[in-house]
């Protein structure tokens, strides 16, 4: 099925599964939820997200199919002593079918579930990771999920190329459908097993409240396949 998704590309990205949601039912992450977590976000946070009714859920492995990188607003970057990069209102770098672009948090979190992973790296290492990530802005989306090349990037490849080789970050690609890649669930698993990330918060796994701390970690673990 993963191979079929590679071939179908953007067509499947647009499709929704029938009967998962009632007609007119919106996303479970509301504007109120986004405002609740906004002040808790930090530059370098990794967003892992899910749409309950996405057709791609049938083709991509695991509960969590998508990833994005939070760059942060100018004020947060100043507080951490990070470069401002550019005066831009968007603060998430995300690879979607229309390419690698800076986007508003509201767009990235227009989803049903999310988990926020916080990399355990120094400020200098974080600066390096964000600088690397932003070099990929404007590239096309990689519907082939080919991690051997950087001309086009899929969502998790953007995160992989931002952090891999910085500090203790050494993520192992896994073989799927004859090629090496890093699905979002594998990114989560390796990040937790190697102690590279903390689970900052989670939403949409067990109810519609934002959970933090150990409960957030336990809920995330409950979604991962053995």
Label every PLM stretch briefly.
Residues 1-226:
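Cysteine-nucleophile amide-bond enzymes
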């Amino acid at each position: 099925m993963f191979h079929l998704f590679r071939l179908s590309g953007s067509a499947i990205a647009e499709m929704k599964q029938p009967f998962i949601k009632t007609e007119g039912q919106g996303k479970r992450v509301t504007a109120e939820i986004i405002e609740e977590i906004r002040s808790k976000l930090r530059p370098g946070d990794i967003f892992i997200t899910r749409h309950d009714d996405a057709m791609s859920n049938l083709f991509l492995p695991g509960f969590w199919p998508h990833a994005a990188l939070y760059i942060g607003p100018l004020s947060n970057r100043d507080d951490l002593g990070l470069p401002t990069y550019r005066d831009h209102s968007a603060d998430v770098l995300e690879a979607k079918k229309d390419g690698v672009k800076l986007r508003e948090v509201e767009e990235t979190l227009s989803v049903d579930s999310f988990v926020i992973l916080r990399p355990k790296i120094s400020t200098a290492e974080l600066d390096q990771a964000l600088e690397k990530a932003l070099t990929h802005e404007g590239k096309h989306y990689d519907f082939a999920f080919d991690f051997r090349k950087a001309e086009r990037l899929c969502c998790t490849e953007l995160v992989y190329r931002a952090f891999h080789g910085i500090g203790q970050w050494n993520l192992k690609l896994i073989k799927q459908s004859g090629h090496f890649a890093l699905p979002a669930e594998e990114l989560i698993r390796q990040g937790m097993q190697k102690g590279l990330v903390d689970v900052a918060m989670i939403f949409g796994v067990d109810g519609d409240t934002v959970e933090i701390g150990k409960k957030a970690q336990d809920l995330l673990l409950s979604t991962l396949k053995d």
